Regions:
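Membrane-embedded transmembrane alpha-helical bundles that form the catalytic cores
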Residues: 2-518
Length: 519
């Protein structure tokens, strides 16, 4: 306990007036994270003032918006101006759209919004990728045509910084404009209300992607957090911290990164364990962030939809995408797949629409061939599953309707298909993908497994614990949540203090940025 008090005292000393400049200044190499001690101390102060303003609507909106902009500044520096520009642009476009009577005029406003939003996203995220492709094509043409000037073209990437969370808030603003166009929501009258929605800090930099029709009505309600909701929010924050700080960061730094940095130095069984480790790492990292975002929002009186639902328990690839990153998969379905025609244009067109949707979903994650192939893999898998479901009636039962033995087999097949995709997702190059697969299929050496258990005890234990927690029944998770929810406030405060202590302890080992910050 003395060690805990000393750590807290040390941290408070770091938050003295002498360090105030550091707190207010953006540091490129140290963006603010939910899993950082700094965020927790800032949030506690923010929450106290927030609750005192709960009956003052406009003041509360301005206060939260300013804190959200500060939070984004601490994550991306002066790119908060870009966030404000995108928000202002789409707010004005939605206002103009409602004053336009003709259908084609309204469509023109939607097109303008897409051009602005996707144009900015394309520049910051894909411009270098497109230049690299163009340089490669020019070089190949020069070789074929014997043109030395074309052959001598080399690719030099521009120094373009990717604003944190641009893919997430761009999708949010696009969905708002489209929903206004479709008549599903009325446009907001006040600019500050829309900026509040776009910049709301719990989900700003890595989701979940929140729909305007779900979020905006909650802005105008007086935030009332019951004891049960406070306990639920605290439970989600604690779960997210454990997933991220204890499991994801540890197995990443101590095993997974080593495997993917040099696959040929390890046997096939170690490479396979590295893939299993990354599957757990990315789940704990991203779902951990989502848990914290949902929990923090709940502590502020806002309820978000679940973003992850034990995805590795899925028995089919279709079920996986109903459980993994639910806010993105539902967004792709509602605003891309259905807009392409969905399943209304015939069987072949349905398969093509699935493939296009997942290809663009892969490209959304990153500008590289490996992400495109990852999206293509999932698109083909979804199309194949739909084909099987349509032509073989014995495969139609899903979920709890499946026979237990079939569900076990389905979970194993789906999990390993997803893991194969994670190799594409994690590898720095296609060469690394080839090396990992080569080691797994030609240099397996299963006897090395026991050496892994002995040599990486901490990694092995955390991987076992992580997968057990993931596959445990929902009732067990609800039971754990009930323990936290029903605990006295003093016990909950102790739990939060312990969580902060864990964050401070692990900070010395280097808290890693969330994986989805790069998207």
């Amino acid at each position: 306990m003395n060690d805990f008090i000393n750590k807290m005292g040390e941290y408070w000393s770091q938050l003295s007036f002498d360090k105030l400049g550091d707190i207010l200044t953006y540091h490129h190499n140290a963006p603010i994270l939910f899993s950082s001690g700094l965020f927790f101390f800032l949030f506690i102060g923010f929450l106290i003032i927030y609750m005192s303003l709960r009956k003052h609507l406009l003041t509360r909106i301005i206060y939260v918006t300013l804190f959200s902009i500060y939070f984004y500044y601490k994550s991306s520096g002066l790119f908060f101006f870009l966030l404000l520009f995108v928000a202002t642009s789409d707010f004005c476009i939605a206002q103009c759209m409602t004053k336009t009577a003709s259908k084609w005029g309204r469509k023109a406003w939607v097109v303008l919004s897409l051009c602005v939003d996707l144009g900015l996203l394309g520049y910051f995220k894909y411009f270098n990728f497109l230049r690299e492709i163009m340089a490669a094509v020019a070089h190949e043409l020069g070789y074929q045509l014997g043109n030395t000037s074309l052959q001598n073209i080399t690719y030099q990437p521009l120094d373009i910084f990717l604003p944190v969370g641009i893919s997430f808030f761009t999708f949010q603003t696009i969905s708002y404009v489209i929903d206004v166009y479709r008549g599903r929501i009325a446009p907001l009258r006040r600019w500050i209300d829309y900026v509040f929605y776009v910049s709301f800090f719990p989900q700003l930099v890595a989701g979940p992607i929140v729909r305007a029709r779900d979020f905006i009505p909650q802005i105008y309600k007086t935030p009332v957090v019951t004891r049960a909701e406070f306990g639920e929010g605290l439970f989600l924050v604690l779960c997210g911290l454990f997933k991220k700080t204890v499991i994801s960061d540890y197995i990443s730094l101590n095993f997974v990164d080593r495997i993917f940095d040099a696959p040929l130095l390890y046997t096939g069984v170690e490479n396979l364990l590295g893939v299993y480790g990354y599957a757990l790492q990315i789940y704990c990292d991203f779902s951990g962030y989502s848990d914290m975002a949902i929990g923090i929002a709940l502590l502020l009186g806002f309820r978000f939809n679940v973003n992850f639902d034990s995805p590795y328990q899925s028995a089919t690839i279709t079920e996986f995408w109903r459980r993994w990153h639910i806010s993105l998969s539902s967004w792709l379905k509602d605003y891309l797949y259905i807009s392409l025609g969905g399943n209304r244009k015939g069987t072949i067109r349905t398969y093509i629409n699935l493939l296009i949707t997942m290809l663009l979903g892969g490209l959304w994650h990153g500008a590289s061939v490996s992400f495109i192939l990852w999206g293509a893999l999932h698109g083909v898998a979804l199309a194949v599953h739909k084909f099987v479901m349509n032509h073989f009636s014995s495969f139609k039962p899903l979920g709890s309707e499946m026979k237990p033995w079939r569900r076990v087999i389905g979970v194993l097949i789906t999990f390993h298909l997803v893991c194969f995709g994670w190799i594409l997702f994690r590898a720095d190059s296609m060469q690394t993908v080839g090396e990992v697969l080569t080691q797994i299929f030609t240099n397996f050496h299963p006897e090395v497994f026991m050496q892994f258990v002995v040599g990486y005890k901490g990694v092995f234990v955390l991987m076992v614990v992580g997968y057990i927690l993931h596959f445990m029944p929902k009732s067990a998770e609800n039971g754990l949540q009930a323990v936290v929810t029903r605990s006295p406030l003093l016990v909950q405060a102790v739990m939060l203090a312990i969580a902060i202590f864990v964050v401070v302890q692990f900070k010395s080992a280097g808290v890693q940025p969330f994986i989805y910050f790069q998207f």
